[in-house]
């Protein structure tokens, strides 16, 4: 209602709204009558809810096997509900001219982390994650190193040379990932490096794969 009406009142089990008006309201078009809904989570309940209701399901950082397992389950729920869901993945990107340089940056980030802060977040996060019925909630199995970049961004292993990172991004795409939410250490300089050195390689890989798919058999 708050997307389409003014002075909204709502009384629910978990929150209440009184005389609320949202401005500006979302753009309303026939093609998209409401904003796309993004949901994160890891538990069985979150995956089911995402498949049934979300337009995008966002995952913490995961390796290939972890992404595939989660993606298949969420999209199975979506298919059962007669829907389609796009999939996003968190990933911390460390792109350098050599893999050695990139790994050294990773080592330095972990070494300089605020240990009490990370451990405090880990303890609270794992308590919450393990409170779910299946103990599969967010951060339930995250290590100290995973949580230095708070949403397990290092697990996606987007760390290395531009060529290595581009190949890994393409591999995630093949597995069904539609979008990567990238994090950077020094974001202004590193986004520029990523755009100049990594992204063109990703586009080259995608174009080559498309040309191969379109080639006559």
Predicted regions and their residues:
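Hydrophobic faces of well-ordered beta-strands that scaffold small-molecule active sites
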Residues: 37-40, 55-59, 85-92, 180-183
């Amino acid at each position: 209602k708050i997307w389409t009406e003014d002075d909204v009142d709502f009384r629910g089990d978990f929150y209440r709204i009184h005389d609320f008006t949202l401005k500006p309201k979302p753009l309303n078009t026939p093609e998209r009558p409401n904003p796309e809904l993004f949901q994160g989570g890891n538990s069985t309940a979150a995956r089911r809810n995402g498949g049934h209701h979300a337009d995008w399901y966002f995952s913490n950082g995961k390796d290939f096997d972890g992404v595939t397992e989660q993606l298949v389950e969420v999209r199975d729920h979506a298919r059962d509900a007669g829907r389609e869901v796009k999939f996003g993945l968190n990933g911390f990107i460390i792109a350098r001219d050599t893999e050695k340089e990139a790994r050294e940056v990773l080592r330095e980030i972990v070494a300089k982390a605020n240990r009490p802060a990370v451990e405090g977040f880990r303890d609270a996060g794992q308590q919450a994650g393990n409170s779910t019925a299946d103990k599969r909630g967010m951060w339930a199995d995250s290590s100290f190193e995973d949580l230095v970049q708070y949403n397990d961004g290092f697990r996606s292993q987007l760390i290395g040379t531009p060529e290595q990172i581009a190949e890994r991004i393409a591999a995630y795409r093949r597995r069904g990932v539609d979008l990567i939410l990238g994090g950077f250490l020094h974001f202004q300089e590193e986004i520029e490096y990523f755009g100049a050195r990594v992204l063109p390689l990703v586009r080259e890989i995608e174009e080559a794969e498309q040309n191969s798919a379109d080639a006559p058999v």
